[in-house]
């Protein structure tokens, strides 16, 4: 049968595809076929929003054009017939004119690495196409499906709030009555000049937007016809009528029905499932109809969730409250269901038929008595969605030929009450741990239960109803007795086995009770004054437990020191200059590694990795892979011409030879003609193993004495004497989990063989061009000078591309060498997370001695890190941990030790902070325990033990310019700490089930590589005869603004405008032997190298300036050229006076320190473990800021990354060492709604740093630890909750490991519900996940 043509429009241009493949996504088509590379691949599963585009189509039922955002990574091109697609390139560019959305995110400093920026731009653009004057709330909601790892979100929201009709941001000028700064009474703030000026923004003119293609509009009256598209493996049929659909389903009962592809697409990509026949019913009128009937509202099964949401919101606004109880429950679930990109395309029927055991909506439909109409050819039936509808895992009552036609959501009745609840790791766009719908109907005029339905997701392999428990409550009265009976019944009926998938057994069981308690209280509250004698009364301190989460109006302040009066306007140092690439990033024009156009005859590589943690490789069978179309070759260790040894210590392999030592260990690689063929071929390579004993956890390693190297140790004073003199000694153990880098751009390399003398050029997303160059040369067996590595920019790095990027680069280089073709590989998100490792998990065993006054006299801490299957940077990371075990506190007698645990996990590596945050966290934990034990305020004990200017640290480095006391005082004052502490105490007395906590903590972070030889930098400057300057340096740009700062440095040094200076890329043939862009030192060392090069140029131009003092820069340059004076020079810098000895505990480990203080306030829900970040104040000493906008962006971004580390991000490993959390659906980084409602950052004034370029300081890593202020505020709130249930025992010490997830918070708030759900694991039980 002949395939149809696919017709759609992209940015106003008609596209006719004669060979549409159903397996091709819109993202792949845009990037490869149309060359529109502004739309990015971040995850491939619709979880990050980097691929967001706007889709527009004529809606026949509504008789209008509709615009909606969608994930291009999930959208099959076959769904786009007669649809108009708008990408970031289609709304504006730097070559023509930026769209106001693009301009505002760029000028408000909302783009750092820029990889997420096009997707965020398109989410905002789509909102404005639908709502030209949105509210602040609508703006925030528009980004539920977008993630950013760099900025901390504040500048994006603040820039886009200028579009809002209510509370539009004035950028800090204070001239807007709705200014976020005026919303809070705070007279302690001295306003700085604004980070941006909204008056410079172009106005939004909705009349200037591109029109919907007239050709598509002319087709609105043409009846749609059935379409058929034939791909390599899949046939796609677009049915146009219900009869066609039912006939097709009868002919192809095994066919999958797809509307939004948000589920099937995931199964095909990540579970390697193949569905040869797909039928799309999205056009069928009956499946899109909405009918308001006498018993409820009926929705066609293909209705998008966003349209369901809109309809229900309208109904709630119009109908009496009593009729809309169920609607409001559905809306509460939809509110947090997913981002708009998913809700706009995912169908209501698809969500039901998917039959997910953790569905947000199915428990609501089951509890409410929702009715489903099911049809097939010749049959039609209506069934209630009750406990029988899901007979088993992922199964429904539908027969093979049946389809779901419509869903009727009922009106609620008189005396009927309904609630829905969901708890996830993150509030926005997250899958549920437990979800539920709850309904009670009372006998008329009484509080006697007539019907009770409690339905849950996440408590079995399907959505279930607690029938045993509910049936016992019929005719009972709604009172405390019923509450106790239901809770006891649920605890017994809804049990989970200790090895249940998803883990978190006690947490999930407790949630079932907590949710019912909330429902019970909510019903009592609604009953209010009408409650009868037999109905319980609502305790006023319980009221807040019934409140649903509400977003408060945001308030953001950024304070910095303005430049001195008289500073030249051309001198941009100290000014809030936007990132120089921000406009290109916002328009999609900025080029990342995978954006480089394809080369002729380019091939694609896919890695083959181990599925065992520790095993011998018995055989590798590639026969099935060879059958895949486009297969070129399989590469193994036998194909390597040079050395298979790689890694910093030669303890790794390019490809595993005989043994694999972790799940994800690279065994080989498949090369093919397309990425899809390479992926398919890699999946069918068969490896057989002989398993060996594996060590997964830190505890396993300690037990088996499995370590790298010997113990590291720093010791000072007399520990024995210190402990003997102490009034109190507290000892304990603490664990801090790992963290994935989750840079939005995964690892990517393109290798181009040059064909002469082993030459090869590589484009790489790496922080370490030098190691990439040397590792590739070693693997190929050629001199390093034959390998050229080029880095334009990265879409984030955070340490994850310091060494682990070489894993991909050496494999791709080998493929290019073997085939003679250019070869490209960009890892999928799930591969990237599996293979490349992350932040080291730490276990600490500590003992601290202190006086009754809180003065610490002795400290001993043993640190253990999970290094993984190679040394990598683990030794240096442990060194830095030991250097930071004191934080800001003077401890006279101290000993710290460190061991690197050798385990069978992917090697852990550098991550922003580099061991510092782990040790600092441990320090603040024992510090808080000292305060609790002494019965003293924590802030008092911290202050009492704080270093003073000139003190020696435990590693005997003198503290110069110690500004923590200044930061501390300013933070106490600006945060109104003591007044708010009283308010927190008052809140906690008045609220039983919600508690608030407040914490202020300092940080001290050493600046330098701890390996002295790395503290060197080179720069190369070319001045051209037109006066333009090209700067090259050894540092790489990953969003931190390094190139921008280097241009500022050169501009100031040469006294020329920044417009004359350009940095193109980082390459090994311009600046060789460069240290990795890491340790926060790049601005310091490369800034000084650029400065030195500039001084050389100035010295050479000096004679010509003297000859022509009134001349211009161009005149002097031309005169020098004509006099044959070199206008090219290098600059070099080495950091002085470095070199610490562990043997003698002497010498400087660091050049200087960066300091800061943060105060955070949180509110926790004691019943669910949810928490809300209310406010954070940060005071940071960054010296004399080179660029306050970039530095504040680094402070906020680092803080939010730290907030993720300490409260949200959790890696789950199976007992066999396999990573469960391999993408944004299961691994949660902070989202837009995770940041503090009030977010205030102040750069300390008048604190120049004489040790760095233009008196500045490093800023990249130091603020990250301040995210722990949120963790300890949470712990403060938990302490209040525990005290309430333990007769006010405020001196209780309890362990809270990091991260403080909802599970840990809820389990720590011990109460009558948690005691009912204690679960003991049998000794032979294998848990779902391990703490590694």
Swiss-Prot record:
The active site is at 1261 (proton acceptor). Disulfide bonds join 535-992. Residues 4-91 form the 2Fe-2S ferredoxin-type domain. It catalyses: xanthine + NAD(+) + H2O = urate + NADH + H(+); hypoxanthine + NAD(+) + H2O = xanthine + NADH + H(+); xanthine + O2 + H2O = urate + H2O2. GO terms for biological process: xanthine catabolic process. FAD binds at residues 257-264, 337, 347-351, 360, 404, 422. It is an enzyme of class 1 (oxidoreductase). Residues 229-414 form the FAD-binding PCMH-type domain. Detected in milk (at protein level). PROSITE patterns: 2FE2S_FER_1, 2FE2S_FER_2, FAD_PCMH, MOLYBDOPTERIN_EUK. Binds 2 [2Fe-2S] clusters per subunit. It comes from the Eukaryota. [2Fe-2S] cluster 1 binds at residues 43, 48, 51, 73. One of its GO terms (molecular function) is iron ion binding. Changing residue 427 to Q: Promotes conversion to the oxidase form that utilizes molecular oxygen as electron acceptor. Interferes with normal conversion to the dehydrogenase form by reducing agents. [2Fe-2S] cluster 2 binds at residues 113, 116, 148, 150. Subject to partial proteolysis; this alters the enzyme from the dehydrogenase form (D) to the oxidase form (O). One of its GO terms (cellular component) is extracellular space. Homodimer. Interacts with BTN1A1. Belongs to the xanthine dehydrogenase family. NCBIfam families: xanthine_xdhA. Key enzyme in purine degradation. Catalyzes the oxidation of hypoxanthine to xanthine. Catalyzes the oxidation of xanthine to uric acid. Contributes to the generation of reactive oxygen species. This is Xanthine dehydrogenase/oxidase. It comes from Bos taurus (Bovine). The gene is XDH.
């Amino acid at each position: 049968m002949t395939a149809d043509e696919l017709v759609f429009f992209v940015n106003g241009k008609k596209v006719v595809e004669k060979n549409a493949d159903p397996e091709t996504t819109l993202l792949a088509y845009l990037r490869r076929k149309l060359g529109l590379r502004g739309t990015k691949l971040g995850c491939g599963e619709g979880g990050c929003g980097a691929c967001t585009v706007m889709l527009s189509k004529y809606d026949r039922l509504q008789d209008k054009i509709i615009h909606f955002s969608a994930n291009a990574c999930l959208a099959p091109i076959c769904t786009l017939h007669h649809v108009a697609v708008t990408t970031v390139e289609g709304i504006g560019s730097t070559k023509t004119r930026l769209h106001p959305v693009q301009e505002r995110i760029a000028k408000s400093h909302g783009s750092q690495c820029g990889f997420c920026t096009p997707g965020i731009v398109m989410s905002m653009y789509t909102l404005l196409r639908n709502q030209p004057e949105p509210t602040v709330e609508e703006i925030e909601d528009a980004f539920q499906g977008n993630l950013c790892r760099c900025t901390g979100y504040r500048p994006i929201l603040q820039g886009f709030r200028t579009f809002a009709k209510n509370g539009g941001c004035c950028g800090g000028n204070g001239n807007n009555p709705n200014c976020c700064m005026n919303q809070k009474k705070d007279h302690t703030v001295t306003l700085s000049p604004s980070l941006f000026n909204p008056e410079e923004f172009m106005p939004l003119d909705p009349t200037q937007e591109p029109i919907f293609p007239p050709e598509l509009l002319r087709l609105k009256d043409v009846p749609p016809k059935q379409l058929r598209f034939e791909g390599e493996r899949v046939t796609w049929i677009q049915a146009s009528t219900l009869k066609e659909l039912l006939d097709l389903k009868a002919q192809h009962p095994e066919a999958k029905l797809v509307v939004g592809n948000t589920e099937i697409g995931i199964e095909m990509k990540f579970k390697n499932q193949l569905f040869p026949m797909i039928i799309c019913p999205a056009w069928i009128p009956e499946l899109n109809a909405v009918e308001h009937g006498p018993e409820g509202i009926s929705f066609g099964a293909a209705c998008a969730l966003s349209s369901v949401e809109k309809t229900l919101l309208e109904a709630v606004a119009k109908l009496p409250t009593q009729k809309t109880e169920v609607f409001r429950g559905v809306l509460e679930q939809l509110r947090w269901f997913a981002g708009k990109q998913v809700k706009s395309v995912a169908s209501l029927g698809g969500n039901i038929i998917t039959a997910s055991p953790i569905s947000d909506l199915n428990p609501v439909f089951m509890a409410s008595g929702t009715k489903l109409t099911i049809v097939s050819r010749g049959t039609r039936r209506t069934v209630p969605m009750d406990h029988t509808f899901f007979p088993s895992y992922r199964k429904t009552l539908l027969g093979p030929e049946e389809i779901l036609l419509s869903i009727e959501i009922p009106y609620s009745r008189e005396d009927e009450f309904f609630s829905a609840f969901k708890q996830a790791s993150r509030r926005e766009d997250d899958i549920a741990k437990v979800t539920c719908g709850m309904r009670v109907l009372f006998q008329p005029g009484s509080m006697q239960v007539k019907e009770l339905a409690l339905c849950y997701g996440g408590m079995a392999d399907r959505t279930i109803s607690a029938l045993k428990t509910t049936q016992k409550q019929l005719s009972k009265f709604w009172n405390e007795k019923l509450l106790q009976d239901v809770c006891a019944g649920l605890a017994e009926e809804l049990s989970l086995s200790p090895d249940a998938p998803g883990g978190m057994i006690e947490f999930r069981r407790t949630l079932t009770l907590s949710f019912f308690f909330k429902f019970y209280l909510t019903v009592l509250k609604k009953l209010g004054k009408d409650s009868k004698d037999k109905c319980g009364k609502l305790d006023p301190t319980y009221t807040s437990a019934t409140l649903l989460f509400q977003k408060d109006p945001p308030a953001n302040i950024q304070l910095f020191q303005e430049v001195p009066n008289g500073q030249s306007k051309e001198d941009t140092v100290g000014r809030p200059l936007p990132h120089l690439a921000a406009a290109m990033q916002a328009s999609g024009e900025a080029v990342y590694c995978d954006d480089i156009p394809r080369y002729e005859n380019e091939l694609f590589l896919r890695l083959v990795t181990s599925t065992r943690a520790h095993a011998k490789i018995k055989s590798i069978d590639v026969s099935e892979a060879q059958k895949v179309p486009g297969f070129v070759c399989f590469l193994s260790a036998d194909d390597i011409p040079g050395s298979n040894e790689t890694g910093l210590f030669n303890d790794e392999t390019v490809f595993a030879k005989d043994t694999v030592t972790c799940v994800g260990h690279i065994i080989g690689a498949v090369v093919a003609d397309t990425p899809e063929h390479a992926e398919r071929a890699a999946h069918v390579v068969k490896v057989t193993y002989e398993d060996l004993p594996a060590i997964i956890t830190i505890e396993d390693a300690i037990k088996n004495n499995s370590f790298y190297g010997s113990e590291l140790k720093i010791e000072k004073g007399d520990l024995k004497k210190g402990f003997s003199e102490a009034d109190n000694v507290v000892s304990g153990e603490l664990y801090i989990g790992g963290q994935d880098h989750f840079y939005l751009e995964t690892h990517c390399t393109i290798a181009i063989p040059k064909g002469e003398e082993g030459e090869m050029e590589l484009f790489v997303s790496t922080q370490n061009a030098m190691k990439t160059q040397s590792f590739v040369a070693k693997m190929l067996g050629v001199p390093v000078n034959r390998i050229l590595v080029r880095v334009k920019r990265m879409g984030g790095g955070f340490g994850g591309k310091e060494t682990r990027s070489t894993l991909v680069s050496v494999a791709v280089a080998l493929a290019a060498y073997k085939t003679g073709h250019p070869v490209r590989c960009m890892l999928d998100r799930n591969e990237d997370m599996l293979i490349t490792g992350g932040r080291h998990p730490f276990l600490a065993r500590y003992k601290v001695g202190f006086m009754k006054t809180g003065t610490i006299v002795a400290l001993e801490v043993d640190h253990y890190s999970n290094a993984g299957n190679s040394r990598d940077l683990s030794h240096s990371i442990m060194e830095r941990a030991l250097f930071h075990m004191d934080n800001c506190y003077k401890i006279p007698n101290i000993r710290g030790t460190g061991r690197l645990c050798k385990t069978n996990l992917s090697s852990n590596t550098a991550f922003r902070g580099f061991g510092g945050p782990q040790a600092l966290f441990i320090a603040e934990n024992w510090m808080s325990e000292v305060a609790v034990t002494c019965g003293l305020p924590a802030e008092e004990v911290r202050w009492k033990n704080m270093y003073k200017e000139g003190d020696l640290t435990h590693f005997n480095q003198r503290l110069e310019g110690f500004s923590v006391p200044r930061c501390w005082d300013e933070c106490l004052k600006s945060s109104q700490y003591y007044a708010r502490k009283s308010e927190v105490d008052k809140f906690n007395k008045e609220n039983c089930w919600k508690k608030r906590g407040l914490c202020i903590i300092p940080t001290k972070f050493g600046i330098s590589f701890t390996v002295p030889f790395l503290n060197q930098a080179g720069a190369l400057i070319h001045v051209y005869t037109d006066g333009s300057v090209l700067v090259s340096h050894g540092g790489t740009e990953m969003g931190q603004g390094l190139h921008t700062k280097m241009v500022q440095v050169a501009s100031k040094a040469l006294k020329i405008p920044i417009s004359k200076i350009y940095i193109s890329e980082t390459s090994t043939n311009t600046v060789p032997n460069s240290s990795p862009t890491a340790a926060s030192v790049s601005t310091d060392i490369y800034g000084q190298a650029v400065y030195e090069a500039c001084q050389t140029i100035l010295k050479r131009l000096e004679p010509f300036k003297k000859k022509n003092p009134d001349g211009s820069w161009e005149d002097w340059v031309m005169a020098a050229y004509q006099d044959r004076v070199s206008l090219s020079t290098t600059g070099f810098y080495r950091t002085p006076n470095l070199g610490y000895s562990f043997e003698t505990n002497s010498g400087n480990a660091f050049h200087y320190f960066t300091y800061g203080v943060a105060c955070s306030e949180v509110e926790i829900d004691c019943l669910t473990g949810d928490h809300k970040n209310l406010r954070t104040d940060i005071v940071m000493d960054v010296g004399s800021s080179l660029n306050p906008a970039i530095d504040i962006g680094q402070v906020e971004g680092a803080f939010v990354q730290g907030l993720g580390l300490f409260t949200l991000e959790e890696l789950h490993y199976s007992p066999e060492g396999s990573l469960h959390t391999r993408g944004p659906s299961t691994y949660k980084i902070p989202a837009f709604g995770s940041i503090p409602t009030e977010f205030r950052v102040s750069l300390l004034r008048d604190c120049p740093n004489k040790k760095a370029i233009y008196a500045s300081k490093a800023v990249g890593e130091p603020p990250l630890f301040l995210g722990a202020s949120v963790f300890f505020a949470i712990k403060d709130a938990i302490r209040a909750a525990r005290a309430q249930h333990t007769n006010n025992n405020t001196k209780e010490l309890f362990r809270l490991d990091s991260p403080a997830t909802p599970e840990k918070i809820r389990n720590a708030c011990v109460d009558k519900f948690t005691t009912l759900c204690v679960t003991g694991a049998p000794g032979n039980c294998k848990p779902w996940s391990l703490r590694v």
